[in-house]
């Protein structure tokens, strides 16, 4: 299990559409980079200058939208994940 540090979050990516609305199959090179994912794990929070730790606003299980080029892609046990900072998360879905 991946356990992020500090204000980082581990995201499982929601895969891009394989076909367009009109039924055209898209090759991998034409697919949009995903911006939606499911939070798998969260870090312990960020530390303020006074040493106080602030908990993250997202939790495991949340579906989120994040910045297009945010984070670092990693592959762990055959699954693709993205590790990013909480500040790169734009919204929680639902």
From Swiss-Prot:
Cystine connections: none
Lineage: superkingdom: Bacteria
Keywords: Chaperone, Cytoplasm
Subcellular location as annotated: Cytoplasm
Signal peptide as annotated in the record: none
GO cellular component, one term: cytoplasm
Cited Pfam families: Cpn10
Biological processes per GO annotation: chaperone cofactor-dependent protein refolding
GO molecular function, one term: metal ion binding
Family annotation (InterPro entries): Chaperonin_GroES (IPR020818), Chaperonin_GroES_sf (IPR037124), Chaprnonin_Cpn10_CS (IPR018369), GroES-like_sf (IPR011032)
Subunit: Heptamer of 7 subunits arranged in a ring. Interacts with the chaperonin GroEL.
Function (record text): Together with the chaperonin GroEL, plays an essential role in assisting protein folding. The GroEL-GroES system forms a nano-cage that allows encapsulation of the non-native substrate proteins and provides a physical environment optimized to promote and accelerate protein folding. GroES binds to the apical surface of the GroEL ring, thereby capping the opening of the GroEL channel.
PANTHER family, A to Z: 10 KDA HEAT SHOCK PROTEIN, CO-CHAPERONIN GROES
Family in the record: Belongs to the GroES chaperonin family.
Official protein name in the record: Co-chaperonin GroES
Organism whose genome encodes this protein: Bacillus cytotoxicus (strain DSM 22905 / CIP 110041 / 391-98 / NVH 391-98)
